[in-house]
């Protein structure tokens, strides 16, 4: 399937899917639009519970996660997510204390970006984490192959 990319380009593959989680609808909208412009598909959630529900139904390639949200905050959602998944999670938060960053990274976040964020930096980090996740996913798939298939190249 051809996916429309920025500036009219097409790419013969499925767009990578990013879940944007923040209780501020304007932030979710602006990040989603930025990601769509870069060729990504986006899903939106407005708290941690909604994010976990989406994760049960959808195959997501990366999560952008706020910390301070109602119902289930970002750190609690991250802990529950890490019980089941290694999908890259980038915390995007107004909490800027070093202890906040250390907590997020210790609980399993792959990166921590402070708000207000720089759009170019956000996109660069998203691309870097997606690259690493693709490499990791490919390695995991290779591990699951029959050893004879790996050694003999499927012959």
Where are these regions (language model features)?
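Conserved phosphotransfer cores of two-component systems
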Residues: 56-58, 80-87, 107
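Short, Lys/Arg-enriched segments at the junction into DNA-binding effector domains
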Residues: 16-17, 128-155
């Amino acid at each position: 399937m051809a996916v429309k990319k920025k500036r009219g380009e097409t790419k013969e593959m499925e767009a990578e899917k990013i879940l944007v989680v923040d209780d501020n609808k304007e932030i979710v909208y602006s990040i989603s639009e930025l990601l769509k412009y870069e060729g990504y598909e986006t899903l939106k959630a407005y708290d941690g519970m909604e994010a976990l529900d989406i994760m049960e139904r959808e195959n997501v390639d990366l999560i952008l996660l706020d910390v301070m949200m109602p119902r289930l905050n970002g750190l609690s959602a991250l802990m529950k997510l890490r019980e089941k998944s290694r999908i890259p999670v980038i915390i995007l938060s107004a909490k800027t204390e070093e202890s906040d960053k250390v907590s997020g990274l210790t609980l399993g976040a792959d990166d921590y970006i402070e708000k207000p964020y720089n759009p170019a930096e956000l996109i660069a980090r998203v691309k870097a984490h997606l690259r690493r996740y693709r490499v990791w996913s490919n390695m995991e798939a290779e591990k699951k192959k029959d050893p004879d298939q790996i050694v003999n190249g499927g012959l």
